[in-house]
A protein has these predicted regions:
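Cytosolic regulatory regions of ion transport systems
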Residues: 1-188
């Protein structure tokens, strides 16, 4: 179920959700009447109204929703949402900004940092390893990275083996320490 105070937003959400209601998510009685406590998961995606976001999250915690995700727009906002009881706080604008910034240099196509010490990076094969098999390229020993999969030409991503031939233009997904993955993606 989706809940929003804005009629236009509610109308647009009907394409994605089976049941959408125009209501005030910051009113505990309304949330009870709508049966919010019957749901296993709630997502608070209130945009710029920090007070409404915190209040809606608090109400869902009070209704004992087992899993609550909440969107934060600042670090302080995120800290408050955690203290109020959100189980997971996400920063979509910040995270997407970081992700896009990583694709602006080198050969990085996509970047996903899972924590400060581990990232998945989609990148093209550098000239230094093109024409070699995964075993002879020694990416793990030289760069400390694991090659998760490869996409050759217009084909799908496939798991690699030591015999996988790395060709210029192929796309790799590598996993490892972010700094090392960025260095690998910056090779010529």
């Amino acid at each position: 179920m989706g809940i929003d105070a804005d009629a236009e937003t509610v109308q647009g959400a009907t394409r994605y959700l089976p049941h959408v209601v125009q209501a005030d998510a910051t009113d505990v009685d309304t949330m009870r009447e709508l049966g919010a406590s019957d749901f296993e998961t709630a997502v608070v995606a209130i945009g710029t109204d920090i007070e409404a976001s915190i209040l809606a999250t608090y109400i869902l915690v009070d209704l004992k929703i087992p899993r609550i995700w909440a969107k934060a727009i600042t670090g302080s906002h995120g800290s408050i949402l955690e203290r109020v009881g959100a189980h997971r706080v996400v920063f979509p604008e910040r995270d997407m900004g970081i992700r896009v910034a990583h694709t602006l240099t080198g050969r990085t196509i996509d970047y996903l940092e899972l924590d400060p010490h581990f990232a998945l990076v989609e990148t093209t094969v550098p000239k230094e390893v093109a024409g070699k098999t995964l075993a002879t390229a020694e990416i793990r020993s030289k760069y400390g990275l694991t090659v998760v999969c490869v996409k050759q030409g217009n084909g799908p991503f496939t798991y690699t083996t030591p015999d996988t031939m790395l060709r210029e233009g192929d796309v790799l997904v590598v996993a490892g320490e972010p700094r090392r993955a960025e260095e690998f993606a910056s090779l010529e």
